[in-house]
Amino acid sequence: MNQLAKLFDRIIGKVNISLREFNFDAAQYLKYLQDYIPLRQLIKFYAFYGVTGQQPFNFHFSRSNLAGSYFLGNCKVDNAILYKSDIRGDELKSKGDTINYQGVDFTLDLDEKVRIQDSILVKTLVHNCSNDPANPELFLIKNAASTPYANIHGSLVEGCFLGPFATADLTRLHGCILGTYAYVQTGELWKQHVANGRIWIRNNNRFEFSYRFPPKVLDRYIHFKIGQQPSGIFIDFIRKRKEHFQRIFDAVNLEPPAMVPKSTSLSRYAVVRPKTQIGENVLVAQRAYLENAFLGNGANAQENCYIINSRLAGNNVTAHGAKLVHTRLAKNVFVGFNAFLRGTADCPLDIGKGSIVMPHTVIDLRQPVAIPADHLVWGYIQKPNDLKYHTLSLKKLAAVRRQKTIKTMKFRGNGAAFVQSFRHRIQHILEANGAYFDGKRHRGHAQQDQNISFNIIQPYMMGPKKGLFPTLDIQP
């Protein structure tokens, strides 16, 4: 057994110890990895890191495999297997920044760092910054395993397992299991098993939103069982377009498309297919896919987003993993993590100005659907009649003071606080992305991420360390 195989077993053991209360065996769920990602895959792909003149960076890699993964910012990785994952540290806090927690101000003494230890991340996005008030300078992922297309967004993850397309958003997780396509934004969870397809948002005692997909519906879109690879419509959709990414990762230098404005950032690791138009102050992240897409001024496409035969009018947030097909978004529409919005040429989807599509929403149309302006959208929609059970005007939601139940969607608490919280966050995302850049002020990712220098690193190709990457310290 070489050192990489021993590393795999070591990580599995640590995850299992952390989840022993659930009688959970990560090895059974991750057994497919040894077929899905055999050793030849782990030595086939290089890792790469980005350097800018504006983003602090300090990389440390030891006793790890980093095949196909991307790093930006301050990152420390020890005893880990990261396969085609994105560790994007462009929103980490800097030395001297001040944060406020429950009325108390803290000033950071150090630049914040992402630390990944004793973990397996497969096609996983890590982004944002630590939301742990006890450790504001450390974004920690430890003794954890995540499966394809999970998102770890501003979330401490310690001793956890994340299923396919699961999202941990602004939540500190300790000894938890996030089921397939589960989404949590709850502040903190200890020793909880969040069911497959559950969308759960909680803000202390102010409000709580909860919805769960019917299991039969969810299984068609993403299915994950012991010893099997993830399968379903989501996987088929991605696999169908996989070959287009191969060229951009194989090429050393690629000329950017001529139509990119100076105030826009288009990653050289994004796919841009014919008939695509990109406006000003737009951010297109690595592993995004655009085909016959119109992105108006201030729009964005984050990691693992697919925008096909669709039009975004402007100032649209398309969060990590969202997919839009034959969809028209009016201005200021928010589409959440891993949402799947698929119309057709005969059955397009229109979403009105200012509407909020909740994370992990599935709209897969059999008839044309038009969602009015300023509505909240969730759940599973195929035809216009579904809207009465899966949408609610933001005005009506803001009027809720105690609770609101619509079929399996349950909301309790202050509706106005919920709407205000979402509006505030969307505004922050647009500002961070540089949507409001006027040529001098309000710079963001769209302007700051334009001149990234990419550098590649490769693993040992033979011997007992085959598949491991050399220990590296990379400093300014």
Regions found by a protein language model. Give the residues of each.
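Extended low-complexity, polyampholyte segments enriched in Ser/Thr/Pro and acidic residues
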Residues: N2-L19, L30, D35-G53
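Glycine-rich hexapeptide-repeat left-handed beta-helix
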Residues: D9-K31, D86-I141, P148, I152-V157, ...
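Extracellular beta-rich repeat passengers
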Residues: I43-K44, Y49-A67, F71-L72, K76-I81, ...
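Eukaryote-specific, low-hydrophobicity, charge-rich regions
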Residues: Y46-A47, Q55-F61, K240, H244-L266, ...
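Short, conserved secondary-structure segments in the cores of folded domains
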Residues: G73, E112, L254-P256, R268, ...
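Beta-propeller domains
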Residues: P261-N292, G296-G298, Q302-E303
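Transmembrane alpha-helical segments and their membrane-interface loop/helix boundaries
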Residues: Q447, I452, P464-G467, T471-P476
